[in-house]
Amino acid sequence: MTLLNAPAYDEQKENRKHNILLGSGIFLAAMVVLTLAGYLLGHGWLFTNLPAEHRMKVFLTTVQAQDYPKAYGIYYNDPQWQQHPDRYKDYPLQRFIEDFTTESDWKGQVTSFHVDFSRRNKTGVVVAATINGTTNLTLMICNSDGTLAAYPYVLTRGF
């Protein structure tokens, strides 16, 4: 094929190529924005930590409603924990209730809370919440078994 007998211009093919390039650019820009927004807002890349934050919210809502047996089941990721309480004899329900009421850092019932942000590490997702407007609570949701665990460090926003 020489320059003098070039193929005819196909407008439909060119429009399709243009639309694919434009759509790919828009998709790429949206992914970059979502990725950075999730990270900067403290919810993980592409908001991947939102399920863990939701779990923490369900747990704290249950504690706020003073349904401690249900909260204990959420804490251990075992809704049927009452059928085998001997598995949890190292941290019994009574101690759990004390830890989330009188012996807690906020010294009483949970009256309000806000799940602030989260960070992912090798073993799970660490979620920070504010209890009763002033006190920080940091729990880790373990990847291995889905249980909640006390996290010894204060989680702060930042890079």
Regions found by a protein language model. Name each.
Residues 18, 51-56, 74-77, 146-149:
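Short, structured coil/loop segments at alpha-helix boundaries
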Residues 2-12, 18-23, 92-107:
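Contiguous hydrophobic segments
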Residues 26-28, 111, 127, 136, ...:
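Polar low-complexity intrinsically disordered regions enriched in Ser/Thr and small residues
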Residues 63, 100, 104, 147-150:
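Hydrophobic, Leu/Ile/Phe/Ala-enriched alpha-helical segments that form helix-helix packing faces
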Residues 42-44, 84, 101, 133, ...:
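Short, flexible coil/linker elements and helix-boundary hinge sites characteristic
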Residues 2, 12-14, 21, 130-159:
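Short beta-strand edge/turn micro-motifs at domain boundaries
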Residues 5-61, 65:
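Short, low-complexity N-terminal intrinsically disordered segments enriched in polar/charged residues
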Residues 54, 58, 69-126, 130-131:
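Short solvent-exposed beta->alpha transition segments
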